[in-house]
Swiss-Prot record:
Keywords: Cytoplasm, DNA damage, DNA recombination, DNA repair, DNA-binding, Endonuclease, Hydrolase, Magnesium, Metal-binding, Nuclease. The active site is at D17, E76, D148. GO terms for cellular component: cytoplasm; Holliday junction resolvase complex. Mg(2+) 2 binds at E76. Binds 2 Mg(2+) ion per subunit. This is Crossover junction endodeoxyribonuclease RuvC. One of its GO terms (molecular function) is magnesium ion binding. Its cofactor is Mg(2+).
């Protein structure tokens, strides 16, 4: 029964690569072990004042959620930047995107950039071109997505792989005394908002 559940599991995942001027987004559908590309692009905020940029990011993310109705929201974690001002603006853009997701009752998951690269390319130090190439292969795309969109899709793919791993752990734990704890953890992690995980 657990193996059947893994194969029938389905969710739409929205990945976000935050930026104060360009915020990439990517949407995939996970059905069991299969990933399907639904859409991607970038929210561009070519204005000077930060408050207006944040407003546009919020509106853009909200519009994407309304259009694609994802079950989960995955976003890149803040990383240390050499320029403190740039890091601050990135953090504000990231926070704005998260608020947009939370206001739509989406569960939010965060991933370090190095983990995303490692998951998609096999190397935590991969460059943007390598990420683009692997995202194109994994999702069987005819054309490479733009860099920011590819990064967002990579984040969504990383979350899909995390779900798959969690379900495999639950499967192996079924016949053990840890099964109840494992399934409770999965419900806690994946059963917020509109999405429901049935085990």
């Amino acid at each position: 029964m657990f193996a059947l559940f893994i194969w029938s599991f389905m969710a739409i995942i929205l990945g976000i690569d935050p930026g104060s001027r360009v915020t990439g987004y990517g949407i995939i559908r996970q059905t069991g072990r299969t990933l399907e590309y639904l859409g991607s692009g970038a929210i561009r905020t070519q204005v000077e004042d930060l408050p207006t940029r944040l407003k546009r990011i919020y509106a853009g993310v909200t519009e994407i959620i309304t259009q694609f109705r994802p079950d989960m929201f995955a976003i890149e974690e803040v990383f240390l930047a050499k320029n403190p001002n740039s890091a601050l603006k990135l953090g504000q853009a990231r926070g704005t995107a998260i608020v947009a997701a939370v206001n739509q009752n989406l569960p939010v998951f965060e991933y370090a950039a190095r983990l995303v690269k490692q998951t998609v390319t096999g190397s935590g130090s991969a460059d943007k071109v390598q990420v683009q190439d692997m995202v194109t292969r994994i999702l069987r795309l005819s054309d490479k997505p733009q860099a920011d969109a590819a990064d967002a899709l990579a984040i969504a793919i990383t979350h899909a792989h995390t779900i798959q791993h969690s379900l495999q752990v639950a499967t192996s734990a079924k016949s053990t005394e840890n099964h109840e704890k494992t399934t409770a953890l999965l419900r806690t992690r994946y059963s917020r908002g509109r999405f429901r995980l049935k085990i």
